């Protein structure tokens, strides 16, 4: 399938993409958290931020920016530390709000929804490993002798985004159902928020220690 467009072993790629999307990461965790705290609208706004951020990174990977980042340690480190700092900021903010007893059932006005989208977008864009991954993974399924490898890259990128959309939709719908349950279980909600905050801090530490 899509061999005429320079895509190799598409079905193998699809299976690989599914497994990759299922691996827990800060993006999926952020979407799940917002679907629980802000409902389906908050979850899908977070997902939109992730989709757009990923699309930008995929385009940069195709444009050759990934090679520049990989061969320029200082550039890689700048993006890496920015990403780690932002993850630490999000984790600390969640932990602080939980410890102070702030209730996530607070008003869900438009500025809050806008902030969710922006945070998700920044979270996605400040992951230098993602852009390097897209190159190393996609190149295995692209015929370098094809006349238009950009089309091949687009097909693979679109497939990954569609798989991600399906999985994040599942998380968002599940999170919305969980919201109805934890509204009457405040202690459980606090424990859940604390764990999410700690996981973001853990992701920050892992990103800060990654090498290009």
Swiss-Prot record:
It is a multi-pass membrane protein. The chain crosses the membrane at residues 12-32, 49-69, 71-91, 122-142, 153-173, 188-208. One of its GO terms (molecular function) is L-leucine transmembrane transporter activity. The keyword Transmembrane applies. Keywords: Amino-acid transport, Antiport, Cell inner membrane, Cell membrane, Membrane, Transmembrane, Transmembrane helix, Transport. GO terms for biological process: L-leucine transport. Disulfide bonds: none annotated. It holds the Pfam family LysE. It is found in: Cell inner membrane. The keyword Coiled coil does not apply. It comes from the Bacteria. Belongs to the Rht family. This is Leucine efflux protein. It comes from Escherichia coli O139:H28 (strain E24377A / ETEC). The gene is leuE.
């Amino acid at each position: 399938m899509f061999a005429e467009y320079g895509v190799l072993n598409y079905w193998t790629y699809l299976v690989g993409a599914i497994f990759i999307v299922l691996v827990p990461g800060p993006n999926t965790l952020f979407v799940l958290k917002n679907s629980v705290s802000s409902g389906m609208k908050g979850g899908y706004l977070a997902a939109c931020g992730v989709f757009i951020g990923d699309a930008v990174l995929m385009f940069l990977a195709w444009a050759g920016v990934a090679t520049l980042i990989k061969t320029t340690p200082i550039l890689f480190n700048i993006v890496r530390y920015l990403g780690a700092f932002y993850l630490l900021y999000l984790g600390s903010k969640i932990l602080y709000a939980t410890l102070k007893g702030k209730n996530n059932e607070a008003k869900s006005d438009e500025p809050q929804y806008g902030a969710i989208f922006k945070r998700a977008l920044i979270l996605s864009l400040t992951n230098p490993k993602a852009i390097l991954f897209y190159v190393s993974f996609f190149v295995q399924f692209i015929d370098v002798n094809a006349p238009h490898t950009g089309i091949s890259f687009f097909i693979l990128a679109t497939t990954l985004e569609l798989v991600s959309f399906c999985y994040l939709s599942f998380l968002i719908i599940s999170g919305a159902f969980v919201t109805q349950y934890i509204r009457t279980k405040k202690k459980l909600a606090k424990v859940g928020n604390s764990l999410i905050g700690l996981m973001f801090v853990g992701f920050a530490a892992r990103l800060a220690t990654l090498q290009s």
